[in-house]
Amino acid sequence: MKDSVIRKLEGLLERNEEVLALLSDAGIIADQERFRALSKEYSQLEDVVKAFKSFQQAEEDLESAKEMMEEDDAELKEMAQEEYKAAKETIETLESELQILLLPKDPNDDNNCFIEIRAGAGGDEAAIFAGDLFRMYSKYAESNRWQIEVMNTNEGEHGGFKEVIAKISGEGVYGKLKFESGGHRVQRVPETESQGRVHTSACTVIVLPEIPEAEAIEINKADLKVDTFRASGAGGQHVNKTDSAIRITHIPTGIVVECQDQRSQHKNRAQAMSVLSARIQAVEDEKRRSEEDSTRRNLVSSGDRSERIRTYNFPQGRVSEHRINLTLYRLGEFMEGDIDVVIEPLIQETQADMLAALGEG
Protein backbone atom coordinates (compact mmCIF):
# COMPACT_ATOMS: atom_id res chain seq x y z
CA MET A 1 0.00 0.00 0.00
CA LYS A 2 1.24 3.53 -0.82
CA ASP A 3 2.92 5.49 1.99
CA SER A 4 0.48 8.39 1.44
CA VAL A 5 -2.46 6.01 2.06
CA ILE A 6 -0.80 4.58 5.20
CA ARG A 7 -0.25 8.12 6.51
CA LYS A 8 -3.91 8.96 5.88
CA LEU A 9 -5.02 5.82 7.73
CA GLU A 10 -2.70 6.59 10.67
CA GLY A 11 -4.26 10.07 10.85
CA LEU A 12 -7.76 8.53 10.96
CA LEU A 13 -6.67 6.12 13.70
CA GLU A 14 -5.35 9.06 15.72
CA ARG A 15 -8.56 11.03 15.15
CA ASN A 16 -10.63 8.02 16.24
CA GLU A 17 -8.77 7.94 19.58
CA GLU A 18 -9.25 11.72 20.00
CA VAL A 19 -13.00 11.42 19.36
CA LEU A 20 -13.29 8.50 21.79
CA ALA A 21 -11.61 10.60 24.51
CA LEU A 22 -13.87 13.59 23.76
CA LEU A 23 -16.99 11.43 24.04
CA SER A 24 -16.17 10.68 27.68
CA ASP A 25 -15.62 14.37 28.49
CA ALA A 26 -18.32 15.74 30.83
CA GLY A 27 -18.48 19.08 28.98
CA ILE A 28 -19.10 17.32 25.65
CA ILE A 29 -21.73 15.01 27.17
CA ALA A 30 -23.61 18.08 28.43
CA ASP A 31 -23.58 19.66 24.94
CA GLN A 32 -26.06 17.39 23.11
CA GLU A 33 -25.44 18.80 19.63
CA ARG A 34 -21.64 18.40 19.91
CA PHE A 35 -22.04 14.94 21.47
CA ARG A 36 -24.32 13.87 18.58
CA ALA A 37 -21.86 15.19 15.96
CA LEU A 38 -18.90 13.40 17.59
CA SER A 39 -20.90 10.16 17.99
CA LYS A 40 -21.71 10.30 14.27
CA GLU A 41 -18.02 10.91 13.42
CA TYR A 42 -16.95 8.01 15.65
CA SER A 43 -19.47 5.74 13.95
CA GLN A 44 -18.22 6.81 10.49
CA LEU A 45 -14.59 6.08 11.45
CA GLU A 46 -15.39 2.69 13.01
CA ASP A 47 -15.19 0.47 9.88
CA VAL A 48 -12.01 2.00 8.45
CA VAL A 49 -10.23 1.94 11.85
CA LYS A 50 -11.21 -1.71 12.44
CA ALA A 51 -9.96 -2.70 8.96
CA PHE A 52 -6.70 -0.75 9.40
CA LYS A 53 -5.99 -2.38 12.79
CA SER A 54 -6.53 -5.81 11.18
CA PHE A 55 -4.19 -4.73 8.35
CA GLN A 56 -1.48 -3.71 10.87
CA GLN A 57 -1.87 -7.04 12.69
CA ALA A 58 -1.59 -8.97 9.40
CA GLU A 59 1.63 -7.08 8.55
CA GLU A 60 3.07 -8.06 11.96
CA ASP A 61 2.04 -11.69 11.34
CA LEU A 62 3.77 -11.56 7.94
CA GLU A 63 7.04 -10.33 9.50
CA SER A 64 6.88 -13.01 12.24
CA ALA A 65 6.30 -15.71 9.62
CA LYS A 66 9.28 -14.39 7.59
CA GLU A 67 11.54 -14.73 10.64
CA MET A 68 10.26 -18.24 11.39
CA MET A 69 11.01 -19.28 7.80
CA GLU A 70 14.71 -18.73 8.57
CA GLU A 71 14.61 -21.51 11.21
CA ASP A 72 16.32 -24.85 10.58
CA ASP A 73 13.43 -26.94 11.92
CA ALA A 74 11.56 -28.32 8.85
CA GLU A 75 8.20 -28.58 10.64
CA LEU A 76 8.50 -25.01 11.94
CA LYS A 77 9.49 -23.81 8.47
CA GLU A 78 6.43 -25.44 6.89
CA MET A 79 4.14 -23.89 9.50
CA ALA A 80 5.76 -20.47 8.88
CA GLN A 81 5.17 -20.78 5.12
CA GLU A 82 1.46 -21.44 5.73
CA GLU A 83 1.24 -18.46 8.10
CA TYR A 84 3.09 -16.27 5.58
CA LYS A 85 0.67 -17.24 2.81
CA ALA A 86 -2.40 -16.61 5.04
CA ALA A 87 -1.08 -13.19 6.18
CA LYS A 88 -0.32 -12.17 2.57
CA GLU A 89 -3.87 -13.09 1.47
CA THR A 90 -5.35 -11.16 4.43
CA ILE A 91 -3.25 -8.09 3.55
CA GLU A 92 -4.42 -8.18 -0.10
CA THR A 93 -8.08 -8.48 0.95
CA LEU A 94 -7.79 -5.66 3.49
CA GLU A 95 -5.96 -3.39 1.01
CA SER A 96 -8.94 -3.65 -1.37
CA GLU A 97 -11.39 -3.13 1.51
CA LEU A 98 -9.49 -0.06 2.77
CA GLN A 99 -9.36 1.47 -0.71
CA ILE A 100 -13.17 1.33 -0.86
CA LEU A 101 -13.55 2.60 2.72
CA LEU A 102 -11.38 5.63 1.84
CA LEU A 103 -13.48 6.61 -1.19
CA PRO A 104 -15.27 9.97 -0.83
CA LYS A 105 -18.63 9.42 0.87
CA ASP A 106 -21.90 10.92 -0.29
CA PRO A 107 -22.76 13.04 2.78
CA ASN A 108 -26.44 12.13 2.32
CA ASP A 109 -25.98 8.34 2.34
CA ASP A 110 -26.90 8.00 6.03
CA ASN A 111 -29.98 10.24 5.69
CA ASN A 112 -33.62 9.18 5.61
CA CYS A 113 -35.24 9.62 2.21
CA PHE A 114 -38.42 10.53 0.39
CA ILE A 115 -39.50 8.17 -2.37
CA GLU A 116 -41.93 9.39 -5.03
CA ILE A 117 -43.50 6.93 -7.46
CA ARG A 118 -45.50 8.28 -10.40
CA ALA A 119 -47.43 6.33 -13.01
CA GLY A 120 -46.32 7.24 -16.54
CA ALA A 121 -47.35 5.87 -19.93
CA GLY A 122 -49.77 2.96 -19.76
CA GLY A 123 -52.88 4.30 -18.03
CA ASP A 124 -54.48 1.96 -15.47
CA GLU A 125 -51.73 -0.62 -15.86
CA ALA A 126 -49.05 2.00 -15.03
CA ALA A 127 -50.96 2.96 -11.86
CA ILE A 128 -51.26 -0.71 -10.84
CA PHE A 129 -47.51 -1.14 -11.40
CA ALA A 130 -46.81 1.99 -9.30
CA GLY A 131 -48.71 0.21 -6.51
CA ASP A 132 -46.60 -2.93 -7.05
CA LEU A 133 -43.39 -0.88 -6.84
CA PHE A 134 -44.57 0.80 -3.65
CA ARG A 135 -45.31 -2.62 -2.14
CA MET A 136 -41.85 -3.84 -3.25
CA TYR A 137 -40.09 -0.91 -1.56
CA SER A 138 -42.28 -1.33 1.55
CA LYS A 139 -41.23 -5.00 1.79
CA TYR A 140 -37.57 -4.02 1.32
CA ALA A 141 -37.90 -1.36 4.05
CA GLU A 142 -39.49 -3.94 6.35
CA SER A 143 -36.65 -6.43 5.77
CA ASN A 144 -34.15 -3.71 6.76
CA ARG A 145 -36.24 -2.70 9.81
CA TRP A 146 -36.78 0.76 8.35
CA GLN A 147 -39.91 2.81 9.03
CA ILE A 148 -42.13 3.81 6.10
CA GLU A 149 -44.64 6.65 6.36
CA VAL A 150 -47.04 7.52 3.52
CA MET A 151 -47.20 11.27 2.96
CA ASN A 152 -49.43 11.65 -0.08
CA THR A 153 -51.39 9.36 -2.39
CA ASN A 154 -53.38 9.82 -5.57
CA GLU A 155 -55.03 6.48 -6.18
CA GLY A 156 -55.60 4.88 -9.58
CA GLU A 157 -59.16 4.21 -10.75
CA HIS A 158 -58.55 0.45 -10.95
CA GLY A 159 -56.03 0.08 -8.12
CA GLY A 160 -52.49 1.19 -7.47
CA PHE A 161 -51.45 4.83 -7.52
CA LYS A 162 -51.19 7.63 -10.02
CA GLU A 163 -48.73 9.04 -7.48
CA VAL A 164 -47.50 8.03 -4.04
CA ILE A 165 -44.97 9.82 -1.83
CA ALA A 166 -43.51 8.19 1.27
CA LYS A 167 -40.76 8.86 3.77
CA ILE A 168 -38.45 5.98 4.65
CA SER A 169 -36.45 6.30 7.88
CA GLY A 170 -33.60 4.17 9.16
CA GLU A 171 -29.89 3.51 8.97
CA GLY A 172 -28.25 4.14 5.57
CA VAL A 173 -31.60 4.47 3.76
CA TYR A 174 -30.64 7.00 1.07
CA GLY A 175 -27.31 5.27 0.36
CA LYS A 176 -29.19 2.09 -0.58
CA LEU A 177 -32.25 3.53 -2.33
CA LYS A 178 -30.73 6.45 -4.28
CA PHE A 179 -30.02 4.19 -7.28
CA GLU A 180 -33.77 3.58 -7.70
CA SER A 181 -34.29 7.04 -9.24
CA GLY A 182 -35.23 6.75 -12.91
CA GLY A 183 -37.67 5.12 -15.30
CA HIS A 184 -39.04 1.65 -14.46
CA ARG A 185 -40.70 -0.21 -17.35
CA VAL A 186 -43.06 -3.16 -16.96
CA GLN A 187 -44.06 -5.73 -19.58
CA ARG A 188 -46.98 -7.98 -18.67
CA VAL A 189 -50.46 -9.11 -19.64
CA PRO A 190 -53.06 -6.92 -17.86
CA GLU A 191 -55.85 -8.76 -16.03
CA THR A 192 -58.37 -7.01 -18.30
CA GLU A 193 -56.61 -8.22 -21.49
CA SER A 194 -58.70 -11.03 -22.99
CA GLN A 195 -56.35 -11.69 -25.96
CA GLY A 196 -53.36 -12.34 -23.69
CA ARG A 197 -51.29 -9.57 -25.28
CA VAL A 198 -48.30 -8.17 -23.39
CA HIS A 199 -48.63 -4.46 -22.62
CA THR A 200 -45.75 -2.12 -21.81
CA SER A 201 -46.18 0.65 -19.26
CA ALA A 202 -43.86 2.76 -17.15
CA CYS A 203 -43.39 4.54 -13.84
CA THR A 204 -40.93 7.14 -12.65
CA VAL A 205 -39.27 6.78 -9.27
CA ILE A 206 -37.57 9.73 -7.57
CA VAL A 207 -35.53 9.24 -4.39
CA LEU A 208 -34.47 12.35 -2.46
CA PRO A 209 -32.48 12.54 0.78
CA GLU A 210 -34.25 14.13 3.73
CA ILE A 211 -32.31 17.28 4.61
CA PRO A 212 -31.78 17.75 8.37
CA GLU A 213 -33.33 21.01 9.57
CA ALA A 214 -29.93 22.46 10.52
CA GLU A 215 -28.61 21.91 6.96
CA ALA A 216 -31.76 22.78 5.01
CA ILE A 217 -31.77 25.59 2.46
CA GLU A 218 -33.47 28.66 3.84
CA ILE A 219 -36.79 29.11 2.06
CA ASN A 220 -38.18 32.63 1.85
CA LYS A 221 -41.85 32.56 2.92
CA ALA A 222 -42.57 35.25 0.31
CA ASP A 223 -41.59 32.67 -2.36
CA LEU A 224 -44.34 30.27 -1.26
CA LYS A 225 -47.97 30.00 -2.33
CA VAL A 226 -49.91 27.88 0.16
CA ASP A 227 -53.34 26.44 -0.67
CA THR A 228 -55.55 24.33 1.58
CA PHE A 229 -58.16 21.93 0.25
CA ARG A 230 -60.29 19.02 1.38
CA ALA A 231 -58.48 15.68 1.39
CA SER A 232 -59.90 13.19 -1.09
CA GLY A 233 -60.54 10.00 0.85
CA ALA A 234 -60.96 6.78 -1.11
CA GLY A 235 -62.77 3.52 -0.38
CA GLY A 236 -62.41 2.69 3.31
CA GLN A 237 -60.33 5.76 4.11
CA HIS A 238 -61.67 8.62 6.20
CA VAL A 239 -62.85 11.65 4.24
CA ASN A 240 -61.90 14.91 5.91
CA LYS A 241 -64.69 17.38 6.52
CA THR A 242 -62.11 20.15 7.00
CA ASP A 243 -59.57 21.66 4.62
CA SER A 244 -56.62 19.79 6.13
CA ALA A 245 -54.79 18.97 2.87
CA ILE A 246 -51.97 21.31 1.86
CA ARG A 247 -50.53 22.33 -1.50
CA ILE A 248 -47.34 24.42 -1.42
CA THR A 249 -45.90 26.01 -4.57
CA HIS A 250 -42.33 27.33 -4.57
CA ILE A 251 -42.72 30.20 -7.04
CA PRO A 252 -39.03 30.61 -8.14
CA THR A 253 -38.65 26.94 -9.16
CA GLY A 254 -42.29 26.04 -9.87
CA ILE A 255 -42.01 23.01 -7.55
CA VAL A 256 -45.40 21.93 -6.19
CA VAL A 257 -45.85 19.63 -3.18
CA GLU A 258 -49.14 18.23 -1.88
CA CYS A 259 -49.67 16.41 1.41
CA GLN A 260 -53.05 15.11 2.58
CA ASP A 261 -52.52 11.80 4.35
CA GLN A 262 -52.35 13.27 7.86
CA ARG A 263 -55.55 14.33 9.63
CA SER A 264 -54.12 17.65 10.81
CA GLN A 265 -53.32 20.59 8.54
CA HIS A 266 -50.30 21.37 10.74
CA LYS A 267 -48.80 17.89 10.15
CA ASN A 268 -49.52 18.00 6.41
CA ARG A 269 -47.85 21.41 6.17
CA ALA A 270 -44.74 20.22 8.08
CA GLN A 271 -44.44 17.17 5.82
CA ALA A 272 -44.96 19.23 2.66
CA MET A 273 -42.22 21.65 3.75
CA SER A 274 -39.73 18.83 4.37
CA VAL A 275 -40.44 17.34 0.90
CA LEU A 276 -40.18 20.82 -0.67
CA SER A 277 -36.83 21.41 1.06
CA ALA A 278 -35.53 18.06 -0.28
CA ARG A 279 -36.69 18.85 -3.83
CA ILE A 280 -35.14 22.35 -3.85
CA GLN A 281 -31.88 20.89 -2.48
CA ALA A 282 -31.96 18.24 -5.24
CA VAL A 283 -32.30 20.97 -7.91
CA GLU A 284 -29.30 22.82 -6.40
CA ASP A 285 -27.25 19.60 -6.15
CA GLU A 286 -28.08 18.64 -9.74
CA LYS A 287 -26.95 22.08 -10.93
CA ARG A 288 -23.66 21.70 -9.04
CA ARG A 289 -23.14 18.12 -10.24
CA SER A 290 -23.69 18.99 -13.90
CA GLU A 291 -21.03 21.68 -13.57
CA GLU A 292 -18.59 19.28 -11.87
CA ASP A 293 -19.32 16.36 -14.20
CA SER A 294 -19.24 18.31 -17.47
CA THR A 295 -15.88 16.64 -18.24
CA ARG A 296 -16.77 13.17 -16.95
CA ARG A 297 -19.91 11.05 -16.62
CA ASN A 298 -20.37 8.37 -13.98
CA LEU A 299 -21.09 4.87 -15.27
CA VAL A 300 -23.94 4.44 -12.82
CA SER A 301 -26.47 7.23 -12.61
CA SER A 302 -28.36 7.73 -9.39
CA GLY A 303 -30.47 10.66 -10.40
CA ASP A 304 -31.40 10.96 -14.09
CA ARG A 305 -35.17 10.79 -13.84
CA SER A 306 -35.74 10.48 -17.59
CA GLU A 307 -33.38 7.52 -18.00
CA ARG A 308 -34.95 4.06 -18.24
CA ILE A 309 -33.01 2.11 -15.66
CA ARG A 310 -34.86 -1.20 -15.32
CA THR A 311 -37.34 -3.49 -17.08
CA TYR A 312 -39.64 -5.94 -15.29
CA ASN A 313 -40.78 -8.64 -17.74
CA PHE A 314 -43.51 -10.74 -16.10
CA PRO A 315 -44.08 -13.39 -18.84
CA GLN A 316 -40.37 -14.30 -18.67
CA GLY A 317 -39.99 -13.73 -14.90
CA ARG A 318 -37.10 -11.44 -15.76
CA VAL A 319 -35.72 -8.22 -14.28
CA SER A 320 -33.12 -6.34 -16.37
CA GLU A 321 -30.94 -3.62 -14.83
CA HIS A 322 -29.84 -1.62 -17.88
CA ARG A 323 -27.13 0.50 -16.23
CA ILE A 324 -24.89 -2.49 -15.51
CA ASN A 325 -26.29 -4.97 -18.08
CA LEU A 326 -27.51 -7.32 -15.35
CA THR A 327 -30.37 -9.75 -16.07
CA LEU A 328 -31.91 -11.94 -13.38
CA TYR A 329 -34.68 -14.53 -13.70
CA ARG A 330 -36.11 -14.10 -10.20
CA LEU A 331 -38.79 -11.46 -10.68
CA GLY A 332 -41.14 -13.04 -8.11
CA GLU A 333 -38.64 -12.69 -5.24
CA PHE A 334 -37.60 -9.25 -6.52
CA MET A 335 -41.17 -7.92 -6.35
CA GLU A 336 -41.35 -9.30 -2.78
CA GLY A 337 -38.61 -6.86 -1.78
CA ASP A 338 -35.49 -8.96 -2.44
CA ILE A 339 -33.84 -6.10 -4.35
CA ASP A 340 -30.34 -6.19 -2.81
CA VAL A 341 -29.43 -8.54 -5.69
CA VAL A 342 -29.44 -5.41 -7.89
CA ILE A 343 -28.63 -2.68 -5.33
CA GLU A 344 -25.34 -4.29 -4.19
CA PRO A 345 -23.92 -4.69 -7.75
CA LEU A 346 -24.90 -1.05 -8.45
CA ILE A 347 -22.99 0.10 -5.35
CA GLN A 348 -19.97 -2.02 -6.36
CA GLU A 349 -20.05 -0.61 -9.91
CA THR A 350 -20.10 2.93 -8.52
CA GLN A 351 -17.15 2.16 -6.25
CA ALA A 352 -15.21 0.61 -9.15
CA ASP A 353 -15.94 3.70 -11.25
CA MET A 354 -14.67 5.99 -8.47
CA LEU A 355 -11.51 3.88 -7.98
CA ALA A 356 -10.85 4.02 -11.74
CA ALA A 357 -11.29 7.80 -11.68
CA LEU A 358 -8.83 8.09 -8.77
CA GLY A 359 -6.38 5.93 -10.74
CA GLU A 360 -6.70 8.22 -13.76
CA GLY A 361 -6.17 11.22 -11.47
UniProtKB/Swiss-Prot annotation:
Location in or out of the cell: Cytoplasm
Principal subcellular localisation of the protein: cytoplasm
InterPro entries membership: PCRF, Pep_chain_release_fac_I, Pep_chain_release_fac_I_sf, Prokaryotic/Mito_RF, RF-1
One of the record's GO cellular component terms: cytoplasm
Keyword Transcription applies: no
SMART domains: PCRF
Post-translational modification: Methylated by PrmC. Methylation increases the termination efficiency of RF1.
Keywords linked to the UniProt accession: Cytoplasm, Methylation, Protein biosynthesis
Biased composition (Basic and acidic residues): 284-296
Stretches the record annotates as Disordered: 284-305
Sections of the chain in a coiled coil: none
GO molecular function, one term: translation release factor activity, codon specific
Disulfide topology: none
Modification N5-methylglutamine occurs at: Q237
Job of this protein: Peptide chain release factor 1 directs the termination of translation in response to the peptide chain termination codons UAG and UAA.
Entry's family note: Belongs to the prokaryotic/mitochondrial release factor family.
Official protein name in the record: Peptide chain release factor 1
Organism for this UniProt entry: Shewanella piezotolerans (strain WP3 / JCM 13877)
